[in-house]
């Protein structure tokens, strides 16, 4: 295995490389190969971000081991209720400085909010997205995603959160969604002022 793991797209890519070192490819079960490939597909957003030569090598290795891409797709499917919730979140989005900011009125799970943030990146003209919502425990949070030059980690850090360049989050312990959205817009403005 190569020394540097900084260039890896995901933990699943690292595990795939480790498994190659530890045992024969035939020793990996099909379901294990599919789970690892699903992780790589998810973390790279279908091979569009943080993807390098090693990513494709790992995916090809898993495919040769027996991973079925149709089964991988099934592993990543969303149930109908979550899909509807995701699209309701997207309907609430407004474009501000190439950032889609969504603030649904309904209580949301963090998973669905993150999926909606991912989905908003498929819209032309959107370089980043931030979903601000309230979870089932009454906590206000933000889930941010980016595919371009815009670094959502820096925006979320201004709000007390963190993450990485393409995926970040923050939690607001002291305000409702409306106030959190105001803070998000201010953080976006500060980001662009630098």
What residue spans do the PLM features occupy?
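Hydrophobic helix-and-loop "lid/oligomerization" segment in the mid-to-C-terminal part
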Residues: 42-194
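Short alpha-helices
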Residues: 1-59
């Amino acid at each position: 295995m190569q020394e540097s793991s900084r260039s890896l797209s995901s933990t699943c890519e690292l595990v795939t490389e480790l498994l190659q070192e530890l045992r024969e490819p035939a020793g990996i079960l099909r379901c294990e190969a599919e789970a690892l490939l699903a992780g790589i597909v998810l973390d790279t957003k279908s091979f569009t971000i943080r993807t390098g030569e090693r990513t494709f090598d790992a995916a090809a290795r898993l495919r040769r081991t027996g991973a079925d891409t149709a089964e991988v797709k099934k592993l990543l499917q969303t149930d109908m209720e979550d899909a509807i919730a995701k699209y309701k979140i997207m309907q609430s989005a407004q474009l501000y400085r190439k950032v889609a900011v969504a603030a649904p009125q309904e209580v949301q799970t963090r998973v669905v909010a993150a999926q909606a943030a991912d989905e908003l990146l498929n819209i032309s003209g959107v370089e980043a997205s931030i979903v601000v919502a309230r979870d089932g425990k009454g906590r206000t949070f933000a889930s941010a995603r980016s595919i371009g030059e815009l670094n959502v980690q820096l925006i979320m850090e201004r709000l007390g959160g963190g993450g990485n360049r393409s995926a970040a989050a923050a939690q607001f312990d002291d305000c409702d969604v409306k106030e959190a959205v105001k803070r998000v817009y201010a953080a976006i403005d500060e980001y662009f002022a630098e």
